[in-house]
């Protein structure tokens, strides 16, 4: 099937409730982590996204049997590792696939994994992944774009990450779980997705201490049992919907959230003049009849303002009168949304990783998403404009937002995306 562009009729106030899916960024490494157990694992809250199907293809190649046992529930079973390689054809679509290196190495003692792919907005190196595994005793070589890893016995020792890295922490944790060694990771990521991975592994019998701190101690165990686990809500999707409410000057109830995971986003929106009320696992976001204020935003590692909602915040600020400044030192090249927002009338000047935004009303236009979060920025911008905005590149949106058009319609938007059958020769 081939997807048509997303058609949005904007300029309407939105209303009602929208539920957040399980976290894609938590689900992907947890699916990979299921490789470490020979017993059945059932996961709940798994979003049906293209990235999830990509990682399922990868673990299936390695030896996992899987089936959907509910709308967002997935059963995984890896009795044995049948392939210790992760070829380019399976990993080139998504950077998160590189964490299979640590998982295969732990379960099988050796692995060959190609360099990863993903959104094409600049370099995101994996050097910290490789340095960590080498420091802990793995032998790793690189040849022809492939990493070959081998271990003799259990991983052991201490590694200090040179910078905070979510994926690097994932890989080192996965590699160290099985065996009889003791691994200490310093300057480890405290990101919510890392904590969720650790809590999942511990629920299967792993011995990992320090989740949510910068020091992790992993004591190897001989095997992991099966189990059942629910992934955390997607804080990036939640933040996107919060910004959507603000941009359209609407009131939305965003359900199935962890408010404690969204403190930085909530604080910045409140600084702009948006009312946010916590109600259990929901946030009521109210920007009706408000004169929003420009703000300055700088991305940081968690618990700071997340880079994954930087483009969405830029789209919101493009509608707010006055001068705002957005800086993204975490991923300086995450700027593909800017040229497309220009097509909609946005006044954004870029210097390095800094955007200076002069806010004003936007207008509908045909635009194209070049990556996932740029696509989110464009649908936010499109919903602020009177008239029809047509967003091409919807395959990127489908990497992070399940049934987007249907869910937008549920809160009062007019949005349409269809599938076309493609004739095969």
UniProtKB/Swiss-Prot annotation:
Question: What keywords appear on the UniProt entry?
Answer: Cell cycle, Cell division, Cell shape, Cell wall biogenesis/degradation, Cytoplasm, Peptidoglycan synthesis, Pyruvate, Transferase
> What pathway annotation does it carry?
Cell wall biogenesis; peptidoglycan biosynthesis
Q: Where does UDP-N-acetyl-alpha-D-glucosamine bind?
A: 95, 124-128, 308, 330
Signal peptide as annotated in the record: none
User: Which reactions appear under catalytic activity for this entry?
Assistant: phosphoenolpyruvate + UDP-N-acetyl-alpha-D-glucosamine = UDP-N-acetyl-3-O-(1-carboxyvinyl)-alpha-D-glucosamine + phosphate
Record's GO cellular component terms: cytoplasm
* Top-rank EC class of the record's enzyme: transferase
Report the domain of life of the source organism. Answer: Bacteria
> Can you tell me which family this protein belongs to?
Belongs to the EPSP synthase family. MurA subfamily.
Q: Function of this protein? A: Cell wall formation. Adds enolpyruvyl to UDP-N-acetylglucosamine.
Q: HAMAP family, from UniProt?
A: MurA
Its protein name is UDP-N-acetylglucosamine 1-carboxyvinyltransferase
